[in-house]
Amino acid sequence: LDQASTILSLDCDFIGGEADAHRHIRDFAKGRKLNNGRTDMSRLYVVEPRMTQTGANADHRLRVKAGFVHGVASAIARGLGIKGLEAQPLPESVKDGWMDQCVDDLKKGGVVMAGHGQPEEVHVLAHAINQKIGAIGSGVQFLPAPNSGYGTIKDLAEASFDVLLILGGNPAYSAPADIDWKKLIDGKKVVRLGYYDDESAVDADLFLAQTHFLEEWGDARTSDGTTVAVRPLIKPLFDGLSELEVLAHIAGVAKT
């Protein structure tokens, strides 16, 4: 954001309620300062249904219902020359002058951000606009997505297994209605790691008490791809196990 001359927020409260707000605030503030040879501040356009911290800092704010954000994004995309888009409904309150000025500023370079509450269509348009204005690779960086190649509970129902290890969750309660959980685990050895004596714990042959996340070591990945260590805040109150410890024991690692 500190490099963008124009920022368009499509119902994205990046200063307040969105993820990584602390980083976005810092970068946005840098773009608003006239120093280090910079003579122009970044310009912020915000399209949103309610007042947010981002909207309060906007140079140009357009208030529309959440369902009309798609229409505004589509109109801006078509104004930038993106082909193959159909006109979407817009409220009468949207003025052509606002849209034209936003399009003109985006042509000079910028970045578009879509909020997590907006549908897939709005995010696709945001990516298309970023591609059109040359933001990909500069203001927008893509990172490898986390491994999503895990199976589903329906895959489990169709699989052949003897031992089922449940790490957290409560599938006995939350499994889809078309999955007969009792039948699925019939004759199987079920081991459950969890916090509570819930429905899945009742069905388990062996229940392992799980440590609270504030009691365990771990690792995580930030939004910019940085791997970080997670330290416990307190010593375990009880003699529980974390998910990593259980998996380590299964893998034959004596000490974690």
For each feature predicted by the language model, list its residue ranges.
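Non-catalytic alpha/beta scaffold blocks inside enzyme catalytic domains
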Residues: 1-256
